[in-house]
Amino acid sequence: MATKNTKIKNLNLESAYQFGFAMPERPVFKTAPGLSEQTVREISATKAEPAWMLQFRLQALKTFLSKPLPQWGGELTEINFDTLCYYLRPADQVRKRWQDLPPDVQKTFDRLGIPEAERQYLQGVSAQYDSEVIYHSLQATLAKQGVIFLDTDTALKKYPDLFKEYFGTVVPPADNKFAALNSAVW
């Protein structure tokens, strides 16, 4: 019977994380660190959202501030929410072709091991980099079948009524502190 230490050693937990790298930030927009009503308003204004979405975000922020840290999962008490940046836009627009992505973004996905052949095969994907979807491609066959597959910002702009009806219904902001955080600053 293997001991606990042997099992941990076999997991190779002390080796370097193969995806542990960082790319330099070159955002076209970034909020200041910290979470406040001003931060939420700035995100909403930058995205030119309707008033009801701003109200949704502000209510989610109130929920976030009032909820305790969840007890499930790892130790979370050392998170300093005032030092985090909650919104960073790495590009000025969503790209529909892989070739149109900035080279440093392409390099990131290459380093993550997503080969060109897989990118070409999938074609019905969105890729998020920092706070924004920066690449979106949908197979024409899905669109012909009436499938609506959009990044969140585009969905809000193109289908506001549908969006308002369903957004935040699977995991509502009141579910837990982090659901509320996501709803406030997505």
Regions found by a protein language model. Name each.
Residues 2-186:
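Glycine-rich and polybasic anion-binding loops at the starts of cofactor/ligand-binding domains
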